[in-house]
């Protein structure tokens, strides 16, 4: 089960939802430890994000609580402890990943890389 399903079934901002987030946090820790054990931690960038916020059992919406999502980025050439000041949209995530890999964005993309996170 994933946090999205729990949020829609049990509700966002509920004990069940936060329990699921704690479970996911444990999985993230396992991935990070595996990357460290593989000796590639210094060459890795982690991105953790979500596709939408939520109120009650809803799916997105027009309020900030429903539209705002976390965007956590950490790793090689990423500023530590930086808080993004620019407005950011979901389609900027793909543009940021493209910038990490030095890929040219397709002309039709409307996203822009969040350059302020880079050292």
Language-model features, listed with the residues they occupy:
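Glycine-centered flexibility sites
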Residues: 29, 53-54, 75, 102, ...
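Solvent-exposed, acidic/flexible segments
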Residues: 14-17, 21-24, 64, 86-90, ...
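Substrate-binding rim/cap in mid-to-C-terminal beta-strand-loop elements of soluble/periplasmic
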Residues: 62-104, 115
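Secreted, luminal/periplasmic, and some membrane-associated catalytic domains
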Residues: 32, 37, 43, 88, ...
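Solvent-exposed loop/turn segments at secondary-structure junctions
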Residues: 1-4, 52-55, 77-79
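Metal-dependent active-site segment of extracytoplasmic phospho-/sulfohydrolases and closely related
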Residues: 20-63, 97
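Short, flexible, mixed-charge acidic loops at enzyme active sites
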Residues: 1, 6-9, 61-70
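Active-site His/acidic residue clusters
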Residues: 1-23, 30
């Amino acid at each position: 089960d994933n946090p999205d399903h729990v949020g829609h079934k049990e509700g966002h901002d509920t004990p069940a939802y936060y329990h699921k987030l704690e479970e996911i946090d444990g999985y993230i820790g396992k991935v990070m430890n595996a990357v460290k054990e593989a000796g590639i931690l210094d060459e890795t960038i982690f991105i953790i994000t979500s596709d939408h916020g939520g109120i009650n059992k809803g799916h997105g919406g027009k309020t900030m609580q429903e539209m705002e999502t976390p965007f956590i980025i950490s790793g090689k050439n990423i500023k530590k402890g930086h808080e993004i000041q620019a407005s950011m949209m979901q389609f900027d995530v793909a543009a940021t990943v493209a910038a990490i890999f030095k890929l040219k964005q397709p002309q039709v993309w409307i996203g822009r890389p969040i350059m302020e996170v880079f050292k």
